Amino acid sequence: MGAVWSALLVGGGLAGALILWLLRGDSGAPGKDGGAEPLKDAPPGEAAAPGGGPGGGGSGGLSPEPSDRELVSKAEHLRESNGHLISESKDLGNLTEAQRLQNVGNAREYVPVGKVPDTHSRANSETSRNQSPESRVGEWRLPKGHETAVKVAGSVAEKLPSSSPLMDRAEAASLAQSAGHEDWEVVSRHSSWGSVGLGGSLEASRLSLNQGMDESRNSLVGGGWEVDGKVVSVKPRQVSIQFKVHYSTSTDVQFIAVTGDHESLGGWNTYIPLHYCKDGLWSHSVFLPADTVVEWKFVLVENKEVTRWEECSNRRLQTGHEDKVVHGWWGIH
């Protein structure tokens, strides 16, 4: 700063001196010429006393009047002062302008880089904003592996109707680029996920599939599963129970049977005949559900009618999970 101020002061002083020299040269030349001619033509007395009148130098000394030289010198002095003022005003103007430029330069130096307005970058941004999407897409350079995806996206964008402003070529290129990073698996139309309609979506088909599976799980009706509107009965696990009893009949038309509260034993309304083996042994196997408790009895049948019941309370049987042999005696638990 000190060097700048000193340079400005020296320059201002030189400019002021030059202006004063020019003003002196312009004002002194006419005065000299005008004063030389009267001195040559004037009498000796007037030349000796230019301020006196025709009567001599005594009267001139009592009432002196300003001479031409004094007027010229005063005019020169005024001009010099005026020139000095003009030069000072010019110097002050130059100093003010230099100080303003220096302040602007300092401000640019101390302002952060991100805050300084850059007209070049602003013009570039306006130019890039005015560019069409086609030119921007053309400037992008994609890897070789994604060129095919970009072409496919371009064909899809061309097939879309022109009235759709939401999908342009730039967006299609970006979608194709993002799709290029993912691995796609081709699934046949008749897959386990079912077919997706043109107006539907994969999410909708998946929801319908899950809903169908839930309905199939919760469609147990009357001990069976409901499949396509039909009830399919599911039989529980069964075990084989072999009933045996010794009884000697009096006639050949008589035989021993078993009945009980389970439907496999007749439900107390009918009976299950036992087969005669030998030595008065009757036996027969019946399938009953596993882990079930049933009540039953032996009966004597003659001419297809129950003629005798065991003389005891109802027998109870726990089927369990394995085959069993129930060997009882008539009327004895």
Curated annotation (Swiss-Prot):
One of its GO terms (molecular function) is glycogen binding. Acts as a cargo receptor for glycogen. Delivers its cargo to an autophagic pathway called glycophagy, resulting in the transport of glycogen to lysosomes. Pfam families: CBM_20. The modification Phosphoserine is found at S67, S135, S162, S191, S192, S201, S205, S208, S216, S219. Residues 24-333 are cytoplasmic. The keyword Transmembrane helix applies. Residues 124-134 have a biased composition (Polar residues). Keywords: Autophagy, Carbohydrate metabolism, Cell membrane, Endoplasmic reticulum, Glycogen metabolism, Membrane, Phosphoprotein, Signal-anchor, Transmembrane, Transmembrane helix, Ubl conjugation. InterPro entries: Carb-bd-like_fold, CBM20, CBM20_genethonin_1, Ig-like_fold. Residues 50-61 have a biased composition (Gly residues). It is found in: Preautophagosomal structure membrane; Endoplasmic reticulum membrane; Cell membrane, Sarcolemma, T-tubule. PANTHER family: STARCH-BINDING DOMAIN-CONTAINING PROTEIN 1 (PTHR15048:SF0). Interacts with the ATG8 family proteins GABARAP and GABARAPL1. Interacts with several glycogen-associated proteins, such as GYS2 (liver glycogen synthase), GDE (glycogen debranching enzyme), GBE1 (glycogen branching enzyme 1) and EPM2A (Laforin). GO terms for cellular component: endoplasmic reticulum; endoplasmic reticulum membrane; membrane; perinuclear region of cytoplasm; phagophore assembly site membrane; plasma membrane; T-tubule. The keyword Nucleotide-binding does not apply. It comes from the Eukaryota. This is Starch-binding domain-containing protein 1. It is a single-pass type III membrane protein. A motif (LIR) lies at residues 181-187. Residues 233-332 form the CBM20 domain. The LIR motif (LC3-interacting region) is required for the interaction with the ATG8 family protein GABARAPL1. Residues 1-6 are extracellular. The chain crosses the membrane at residues 7-23.
